[in-house]
Amino acid sequence: MSVNATNLGLSIEQAGKVLNAAFKQATGQEVISQLATGDYVSIATMAQRVGYEQMTNALSQVLTRTYIRVRAYSAKFRSLIKTEEQYGNMVRKITYIDRDIPEGDMTRDIEDGKEYSPYKVRKPQAIQTAYYGFNHIDDYITIFKNQWDTALSSGSELQRFISGIMQEWYNKLEQYHEQYSRATLINLIGGTQAYNADTAVKGAGITRPEMVRHLLTEYNTEHGTTLTRDALLADRTAFTQFAEDLAYKMDTIVRQMGERTTMYHVSPLKSVTENGTTAVTVPIKRHTPRENLQCYMLAPFWDRVKRVVRPGLFANEYLEYIKFDEVAFWQNIETPEKINANVSYFKPVAATVASSKTTYAVNNDSGNAAVELPYVLGVMFDDEAAAICYKNMWSAATPMNPAHGFQTNYIHEDVQWRNDNTENCCVLLLD
């Protein structure tokens, strides 16, 4: 397969700089700070003298450090990707719980003959949440001796050689990165729905209906209609009204998430009666400023809005501040609107059935469920509700195989992802 070097924006001058950096990596010497065309042959000759093994290993490290790390952030769902420092601050999260203001007036409720100590203890209440997953990526590519010989013969050949290596690694890593990010988002969407559908959660009366909006049902209720999804999409007048209603509702969600409340997220459970009739949560209050709100929407739906309604409907003073990304498909490109997955979610309460009797208990652990959603329109969430981080990337090359004249370059990378259902999230369904 031929590779066009310009696909990755790599010029001959840049290729020379990469070779220069690799030479320095292998030998500790920097030949020249700015590599001109006339200087190319001399450094190529010196590189050959260093040896294929050292140069390939050094080149592998330089490409990984200089190019692949930068390119890794161009995959879809890029706003989910966090740096190691950002991700580290999320993994072990301490949340402080508001306590009620003491009743009475300490400065006026004073009686003669009584002592009043200023050393009263009022401990702060806090909880720690940690939700995370881990995986590892390995990839490798083989380079032959005659490729090196050809690559070091001219600047244009080196350009094609390095671009070929980068194209191979870049395509694979980008695809892996996108799939991990997609899975992270799918789990957030499906997990939010699974929480509200959980029988124990419903039995204890701690569902969060505002976290999952059934927009078609809402539309039919508000307008006194009984439209199906297909009928709504086919009716220009009804669809226009639906889109305008949706813009208003999204504005409302943005404003509500910006307030510090217990809405749009799950709170841990403090206690629950055996029959589930009385559940006491530990009320976590969250707020999501607009700059911290992420929004992913199904692209085919927005294409229809632009064509049928009007292009600027969702470019108003509120929505223009959302990190608004269109998604071509959630899980399968052939059925872009559907999600069908096994998901994990935060489950505060557990229910046990024995002899036709259901008893409830505090759980505050993870739950698992199979979720099938026929039409996911979008999701709006705090940027701490879902995150993914790539770290510990490194590469190395094997010695040259003397019998067959090749060596293999390996690249390794760790992937960590997380969902936090105690952060604000709202799933928009067209059902």
Regions found by a protein language model. Name each.
Residues 1-70, 299-431:
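Extended, compositionally biased alpha-helical segments that mediate assembly or anchoring
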Residues 77, 127-130, 280-284, 395-397:
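Intrinsically disordered, low-complexity boundary segments flanking structured domains
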Residues 128-200, 406-413:
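Long, contiguous amphipathic alpha-helices that act as assembly "spine/axial" helices in icosahedral shell
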Residues 194-342:
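Extended, solvent-exposed, turn-rich assembly/linker loops in the middle of proteins
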